[in-house]
Amino acid sequence: MKFLFRECKRPLNAFSAANTYMDCLVQTKTYIQLLILILFCIATVYLSFPSFTLKYINNIDILLQYIIKALYFSFPITFVFLLIMWDQRYLFSKKISFHQLKISFFTAFIIYIIMLLFLSVLISFTTFNGTSNPIENEGMTNMFLKTPGIAIQLIGENIMFVSILFFWHKIIRSFIISPITSITTSLILSGSSFGLLHLSTYNYNWVQCLTIIGIPAIAQMIFFLVFKNIHMGYMLHFNYNLIIILFNYIVSN
């Protein structure tokens, strides 16, 4: 009986630990600071690359084009995030071991398989009709050339993950005390918000944004909370995208 009690307490302790960790990260931050991060998240997604610079960029190597555009995407939100969170950087940034890298790849693979199964069920039993990501329509050669740029862009996306999570947790904790309720609600709202930021990318298919984008986003935020390391969230995200690229390459050949 004592063993059963201990096993039942583990999930509760995990929720409590995650909740306490999030409290430590956001308790010294004002709503204005976190709102600034959210506004930068929205601007990062919806402010396109300056058209007047394209005539210069289009004349350079395509690999460098992707890298420059990725830097334009990631640098502003990353800079503002570090500016606001600098005093607590040691709480969310740690070195990654090789064992943790393997865990991130294996977890990304499991998430990818689950999402494939979920998508197949969704298509089979509903009228759901997905919209492909424009990147997937560029051919495998361009996809491989884009990989360095994608790696840089995912830094910005990872910053967006945690920024949105911090924002929602700060709000939720102002009126919800229960660790389980607060951290669960924060994760669901954060994943949904990040998914809905992709509405224009997926032709305003909100179901696809909430499921195909939102669910993996929640998994990546959980990964961040489990390891208390923003880099682990990034590696899970990077490996997830890498698996998608490799799978598309295998299927196309």
Predicted features, each with a name:
Residues 48-49, 81-91, 168-173, 225-227:
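Structural signal for the C-terminal ends of transmembrane alpha-helices
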Residues 1-32, 90-93:
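N-terminal juxtamembrane cytosolic/stromal segments of multi-pass membrane proteins
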Residues 56-67, 88-160, 164-177:
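Juxtamembrane helix-loop-helix connectors linking adjacent transmembrane helices
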Residues 48, 81, 85, 118-119, ...:
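Hydrophobic membrane-targeting signal helices
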Residues 30-34, 65-73, 100, 104, ...:
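Residue-level signature of transmembrane alpha-helical entry/exit and packing/kink sites
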Residues 28-86, 136:
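Alpha-helical transmembrane segments in multi-pass membrane proteins
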Residues 143-253:
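Transmembrane helix-loop-helix hairpins at the membrane interface
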Residues 23-40, 68-78, 102-121, 219, ...:
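Alpha-helical transmembrane segments of integral membrane proteins, especially early/N-terminal helices
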